[in-house]
Swiss-Prot record:
SUPFAM superfamilies registered for this protein in UniProt: L30e-like (SSF55315)
Stored PANTHER family: RIBOSOMAL PROTEIN L7AE FAMILY MEMBER
Compartments reported by the entry: Nucleus, Nucleolus
Protein name per UniProt: Putative H/ACA ribonucleoprotein complex subunit 2-like protein
Taxonomic source organism: Caenorhabditis briggsae
Coiled-coil blocks: none
Length: 163
């Protein structure tokens, strides 16, 4: 097993395919409604289409930064145990639900805003890769502080209304 050259692993067609997938993050109104019908029963509060678009934008900016985004159950649980401040974003179409059903309770206990997004595939694309993601934790950063504050305030009101 020799080392691969960069030319072998990252050809231009693969990069353009990922760019097309990321560009497809915006969904039409009826597509979004169809995705919302596929979510599991515990997916509350579920982001509306406009809020989901802002959350995707926040995730893209956080993914570009360093150490501002955590992905996956283990990493997010570690951040929550450390009492880090941030926003928790969960995918709504995860099966079985038992995998991450305890996360909203932890977020409420630690007063961390959280929201469900209808599709784990789109959550993965927002991070910048093709693999689906079920759970993302975004920490505040000076690079995108204004957008972070806006989304956090909206999520805080969403969480209070749903309780």
């Amino acid at each position: 097993m020799g080392k691969r050259n960069l030319d072998e692993t990252m050809n231009e067609s693969a990069v353009s395919e990922i760019a097309e997938d990321v560009a497809a993050l915006t969904t039409e109104k009826d597509e979004y409604q169809a995705l919302c019908e596929l979510v599991n029963p515990i997916a509350q509060p579920l982001a509306n289409r406009k809020l989901a678009k802002k959350v995707y934008k926040l995730i893209k900016k956080a993914a570009a930064g360093e150490k501002t985004l955590r992905e996956g159950i283990k990493d997010v649980q570690k951040e929550l145990r450390k009492n880090e401040k941030g926003i928790c974003i969960l995918a709504g179409n995860v099966s079985p639900i038992d995998v991450y059903s305890h996360i909203p309770a932890i977020c409420e206990e630690k007063e961390i805003p959280y929201v469900y997004i209808p599709s784990r595939e789109q959550l993965g694309l927002a991070v910048g890769h093709r693999r689906p993601s079920i759970l993302i934790f975004v920490k505040p950063s000076a690079d995108f502080q204004e957008l972070y504050d806006e989304v956090a305030e909206t999520l805080h009101h969403l969480t209070v209304d749903a309780a």
